[in-house]
Amino acid sequence: MKTRLVLVFLFGGIATSVAADESPAFKVIEVQQTGGFAGVNITYRITPDGEFTRQSGRGTVEGQLDAKEAEVLSNAMAGIDWDKMPAKLRDPRVADDFAYDMHFVISEKTHRVTADGTSAAQNAQLEPILMMLVRIQRVPLKQEQ
């Protein structure tokens, strides 16, 4: 089964880590993660103030990144060298891994990177972003009483 994870990054800024006179790093991050061995279908959304939502067939989780996490994410986004980022990061030996289809919108220009999970995690510029998604994925669902 082929897995697909779609990341959409719209640049604007994280309030907790960007001063008013600085150029903002991003505006909103939206991620659609599907496939894998378990056939997952998860949607992520992270706003500039660090608020996040994760939705799946099991339910919805809402939360807040702490200031350090928001800063790490903002710095990771600002640190991507778009001139050196390959459009495709794929390892033909990788099977049944997540696939990432990432869209990065900066002003009027869109950058797209497709990658399998292994290759994306080994890319120093993308790895901090993927690790933040893993952190959000681990937030437990609240049990209704």
Where are these regions (language model features)?
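Short, well-ordered, aromatic-rich surface patches in folded extracellular/luminal domains
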Residues: 2-3, 18-36, 68-69, 76-77, ...
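A broad, structure-centric signal for solvent-exposed, well-ordered loop/edge residues
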Residues: 8, 38, 53, 72, ...
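Short linear sequence elements within intrinsically disordered, low-complexity coil regions
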Residues: 14-16, 42, 49, 57, ...
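N-terminal secretory signal peptides
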Residues: 22-63
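Acidic, aromatic-enriched beta-alpha/helix-loop junctions
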Residues: 57-80
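Sec-dependent N-terminal signal peptides
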Residues: 5-14
